[in-house]
């Protein structure tokens, strides 16, 4: 089994990485950061997001597993004291692969049809560069839906619906549903300007095209990465064809994670 380990960079996570590497020498495991079969993230959800983007070019060939050295995360499901058990599981069993939907966004520029494509595991946001009111036309399936005015828009995946989307009042969506969700960020609603005022959940075959009005410099965030785009014509969002693959060695139910993170954990009862 070819593996690689990425850490948060703190002393606790780095020490755990070295412990795992030494333990893996007793097994038929080869450290290979160029072509791993399994990527082990040590830290938290932020570390796993970084690992996802580092290996987003080979998602069909790699599976991710997370070890959390801080707070309980939605992606990191193993604890530091369980690493030896995890290594044994990796070597002794055929692990189950769970696939989650991803978000695709294509930024189209006014420069001779030039465009760039990105994938997001959690969400992508769209705002102006300087924090002024974002004015955009929202088109769904090729039809004009609304003209949005506000701070911005957040487009999330089902697994990312528990993150920024939840703080915006969006719905929590089970990752088995191939969908994306559009949530408003401080929309302007009065007698003159109106938006739908509710999160929208779009299925896989629906495409959302957002076109800036009177400004062509847009700042997007793609998970933890912030990017400034100049001369933007439009940004297209849809459920990606690719999926992220997680290695599962034991049950890790989505709704239990939601309960433990936002209501109470088992050890608090």
Swiss-Prot record:
- Write down the required cofactor(s): a divalent metal cation
- Keyword NAD present in the record's keywords: the answer is yes
Molecular functions (GO terms): ATP binding; metal ion binding; NAD binding; NAD+ kinase activity
Establish whether keyword NADP is in the entry.
yes
Transmembrane intervals: none
Q: Where in the cell is it found?
A: Cytoplasm
Protein's GO biological process: NAD metabolic process; NADP biosynthetic process
Among the Pfam families in the record, one is NAD_kinase_C
Recorded GO CC terms:
cytoplasm
Intrachain S-S bonds: none
Which Enzyme Commission numbers does its entry carry? 2.7.1.23
Keywords linked to the UniProt accession: ATP-binding, Cytoplasm, Kinase, NAD, NADP, Nucleotide-binding, Transferase
**Binding-site positions, NAD(+):** 45-46, 122-123, 149, 151, 186
Q: Which reaction does it catalyse?
A: NAD(+) + ATP = ADP + NADP(+) + H(+)
Active-site residues, record numbering mapped to chain? 45 (proton acceptor)
Sequence similarity:
Belongs to the NAD kinase family.
Q: What does this protein do?
A: Involved in the regulation of the intracellular balance of NAD and NADP, and is a key enzyme in the biosynthesis of NADP. Catalyzes specifically the phosphorylation on 2'-hydroxyl of the adenosine moiety of NAD to yield NADP.
For this protein, the record's NCBIfam families field holds: PRK04885.1 (NF003424)
Q: What is this protein called?
A: NAD kinase
- The protein's organism comes out as Staphylococcus epidermidis (strain ATCC 35984 / DSM 28319 / BCRC 17069 / CCUG 31568 / BM 3577 / RP62A)
């Amino acid at each position: 089994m070819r593996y690689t380990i990425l850490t948060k960079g703190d002393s606790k996570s780095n020490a755990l990485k070295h412990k795992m590497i030494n333990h893996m020498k007793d097994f038929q495991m080869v450290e290979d950061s160029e072509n791993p079969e399994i990527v082990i993230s040590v830290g938290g959800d932020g570390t796993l997001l970084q690992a996802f983007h580092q290996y987003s070019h080979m998602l069909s060939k790699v599976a991710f597993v997370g070890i959390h050295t801080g707070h309980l995360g939605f992606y990191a499901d193993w604890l530091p004291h369980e690493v030896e058990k995890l290594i044994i599981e990796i070597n002794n069993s055929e692990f189950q692969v769970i696939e989650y939907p991803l978000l695709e966004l294509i930024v189209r520029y006014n420069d001779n049809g030039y465009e760039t494509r990105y994938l997001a595991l959690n969400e992508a946001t769209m705002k102006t560069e300087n924090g002024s009111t974002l004015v955009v036309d929202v088109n769904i399936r090729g039809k004009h839906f609304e003209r949005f005015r506000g701070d911005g828009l957040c487009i999330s995946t089902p697994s990312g619906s528990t993150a920024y989307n939840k703080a915006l009042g969006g719905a929590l969506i089970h990752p088995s549903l191939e969908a994306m969700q559009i949530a408003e960020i401080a929309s302007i609603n009065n007698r003159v300007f109106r938006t739908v005022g509710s999160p929208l959940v779009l299925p896989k075959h629906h495409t959302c095209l957002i076109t800036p009005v009177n400004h062509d410099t847009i700042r997007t965030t793609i998970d933890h990465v912030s990017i400034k785009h100049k001369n933007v014509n439009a940004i297209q969002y849809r459920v990606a064809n690719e999926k992220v693959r997680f290695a599962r060695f034991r049950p890790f139910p989505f709704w239990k994670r939601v309960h433990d993170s936002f209501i109470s954990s088992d050890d608090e009862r």
